[in-house]
């Protein structure tokens, strides 16, 4: 199926939580003296996240299962790392919908992935900075309905790890 009917994430059905004092990537690069911090808004979701240990091509073993957010990160400088517990090589989010999606991403997508829980049963997330084994076996073994590539454009055009997508696994 080329397209599937998706239901927008219902923000009214979930509790919104906020964290202030967030300085993002652009601040980290520019360090302007008059920067105004942003606020992170996220939704309290009961979905689970499993971070997989991948030590060889096509041989992931199940690792730690936890919630979507590491709220301890909200008290440190890199608050954004609270989403999906940072940039893991391979993670799986259990959703509330049906079907499977593979998200190939940089950290730009971490805050977006929770919104996919309304539409997919399994959301696999790959970050090539920490996943060295190509996608062929992963895709063949998991029968994804859709694949989403979600990057910050500047990162995508200069990502030194994208070649790993084509590594034979």
Model segments located where?
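Extracellular glycan-modifying ectodomains
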Residues: 1-169
